[in-house]
Structures are given as C-alpha cells and as structure tokens.
Amino acid sequence: MSHAAAAKPATARKSQALSGTARVPGDKSISHRSFMFGGLASGETRITGLLEGEDVMRTGAAMKAMGAHIEKRGAEWVIRGTGNGALLQPEGPLDFGNAGTGSRLTMGLVGTYDMETTFIGDASLSGRPMGRVLEPLRQMGVQVLKATPGDRMPITLHGPKHAAPITYRVPMASAQVKSAVLLAGLNTPGITTVIEPVMTRDHTEKMLKGFGANLSVETDERGVRHIFIEGQGRLTGQTIAVPGDPSSAGFPLVAALIVPGSDITIENVLMNPTRTGLLLTLQEMGGQIDILNPRNAGGEDVADLRVRYSELKGVAVPPERAPSMIDEYPVLAVAASFAEGETLMQGLEELRVKESDRLSAVANGLKLNGVDCTEGEASLAVRGRPGGKGLGGHPNGLDTTVQTHLDHRIAMSFLVMGLATEKPVTIDDQAMIATSFPEFMGLMTGLGAEIR
C-alpha cells in the first residue's frame, strides 16, 4: 500500500499547560550505528534503549541479510556479528524504505566488498541524491553497476578485489559522507583518511573506537579535522545503552516553551556537543531550559532537561551552527513563529536534500498558517507573533492543510505549532512519524497536548 493510500491526517489544537516527565526514544544516529557495528563486530553486542523506528529496523534487516544474527530478548537487542571483512552477499535488494542514514552508511560499509549489492527505497528516498557518497567510493575502486540518473536509487554496487585507501576531503558538512568513507575504510587495506573542514556529529568515530577500530583524529590549527582509520582490523562486540535522541526531544521541548504555563522534564537526552545547537539557540532566545543531572553514559554526555514556558525573542542563528542542528530547523522555525521580532536562520543548503526539500516545506507550512516569513536560497527569516495571535488554519474555507511531503520532521513540527496557535493546525499525513518517533503521539498527549 502506498503512503498516499494510507494517509492519516492529524490536527493539533490550542492546549492547556503541558506538564509531566517524558523520555524520548533512543538516538537515531547511535541506533543505526549500533546495529551496523554490532552486526560487523566479532562476538556479541548488547543494546538497550535502541530506537525501534522503521528507519533503524531497515538497517537491522540489511545487516541480517548480510549474515549478522540479530534478535530481541526482553528490552535488549542481542547481536552476533560476522566479523570485520566477513559480510555475505545479500540474496536480494536491501530495502531501506525512508532511511537516508542507513542506506548511505551501508553503501560505505559494503561498497568495498567484492560482491554485488542493490539498494532500494521508498519514493522519498529514491528522489534523494546519493552521488555525494558514491563519489568517494568510486575513487576507492567501487563500481556503480546501475543507478537511476542523478545517482539515485535503485543503485547496484560491486566492490573491487582489493579496495584502494584514499584521502578524501568532505566537500560539504555531512556526517553521512564522512561516515560512509570511514566505513568503506574498514574493509580496505592501509589507512583511509577523511578531512573534515566543518565538524559534524562524531558518533561514527567515537563508536568505532569503542568497538576497537584503529582510528585517530587530529585537528590542525585551522580547526580542520583529519580522521585516520586503519582497515581490516578486528572489531569486538560491545554493550551499548543508547541515550535519548536530542532531535526527537526538540518537539516536546519547543511545545513546552510556546504553550503558556507549561513545565516539563525530558529525561536521558544525549548532550553530545555536535548535537546541541537547538538547545543553545532556544536558550539564546530566552527559553528557560535547565540542564539537570549531567552525566556520562557509554562515552556520551547525557542529561535531563527541565523546560518551562518562556517569552521568546528572535535571534540571528550563526550559520556555522547548522551542522549541530540540521534536523532541528523545522521545529526551531515553529518556535520562532511565537517569538518577538525576527529570527534569521542561514547556512541551510543541506535542508534542500533531506527527506523532502525541507526548507520550502517549512516556509510553505508557516505561510499557510499565517506566519510572516521569507525563504532564501539557503536561509529562512521568521517574524513571530507572541502568543500565536491570528496564527493557525484559516476559518474562511481555504484549505490550509500542511503538506508534509512524507517527511516525519515536518509532520511533528507543525503538530507542535498547533498546540499554541489561535486556530488549529492540520497536517496531511502522520503515518511517516513512525520512521523516527513511533511514540510521538502518545508522549505528547501524555503531557497534555491536544492532537488527534
């Protein structure tokens, strides 16, 4: 059944004060990598707190198709990996559904194997460019046997007999490209080097070291990172407790800031500094966000967040902050809609190649609901209305349903918006929220949100 046939609209209405304690699902980036590295490592890997959304499950299914043994026992996932260099050729195509991270990282992981692998995805993923990952793989000797024009899925790869290590400078701020090259380096003799001018989320580096990879990072005087990985070493299974996803935490967090009288606590949130751009920006806007019980879990910083309703003010978000909050701009734009003055977001070119053209999807949704905003090539300026006065769907019969374009973050962001606008906000489809945050509806309504 297609997404279109199964579309489930949803409407959010002005809510009473939100209150209570919530725990968001496990971090998506760490969950994908836990399945991948556990499936590749020798011995047993045990994972608690894994995000059981559709995207991560697709990565798990791909690893199983290549020889890993993965099962759930109670609240824990137990994996017996193949050993580095010992993945098997899958019998059929690897279907990644909507999972951009899973597909791009797996292309890196298996691309340097002397075997044929085909990658397919849903309509949204099949429209996303994969050339940025295929380009360094081609340099390592990987053949792209089949691809849809524009390096889009379906894509069939065949690795070389012996892959060549490369030094690759990542041309854009992309953790996915960096990670794909490092993972390709795992099955490549010698040392593969990635040069990263702008630091992006560093879960791949941290976790590979935890699994025993010979990986080192040097930062030069200009702040450029050089990441070295020695191929064909042994990876050993680990025990992983996945912290809460800061991108998912952004939704209840912004909801509490904009719904008057709210006071909530979000527990066990990942506080890795490459992921806290939204938190920092909302604090600069005047958001009352207290960081409680900061602690270290499995090499990552974790904390609880107490969030209270706040009168927000517009700010200019520095463009260099974009990599640390690239997935959070839609919900930041919602917060900005209730702030006094203008919020300017720049350096957003990566939003054009996400699950949807996320920048235009946000701008169109805001305008439909009465928000004064200006969309640039790589920027968005939002002029807010404190209290949400006059915002929300127009009652005069015009269809103001927000088109989510099969994008889970657009869907959740606009449902958050409707909790504080004068009039309700409706989205065309909530079905794809399950890709990253299956518990979203239950968690939000449990805090008091009016969403149906």
UniProtKB/Swiss-Prot annotation:
The active site is at residue 327. The keyword GTP-binding does not apply. Residues 1-26 are annotated as: Disordered. Its EC number is 2.5.1.19. It comes from the Bacteria. Catalyzes the transfer of the enolpyruvyl moiety of phosphoenolpyruvate (PEP) to the 5-hydroxyl of shikimate-3-phosphate (S3P) to produce enolpyruvyl shikimate-3-phosphate and inorganic phosphate. It is found in: Cytoplasm. NCBIfam families: aroA. The keyword Methyltransferase does not apply. 3-phosphoshikimate binds at residues 28-29, 33, 174, 176, 327, 354. Residues 1-17 have a biased composition (Low complexity). Transmembrane segments: none annotated. GO terms for molecular function: 3-phosphoshikimate 1-carboxyvinyltransferase activity. This is 3-phosphoshikimate 1-carboxyvinyltransferase. It catalyses: 3-phosphoshikimate + phosphoenolpyruvate = 5-O-(1-carboxyvinyl)-3-phosphoshikimate + phosphate. Its main location: cytoplasm. The gene is aroA.
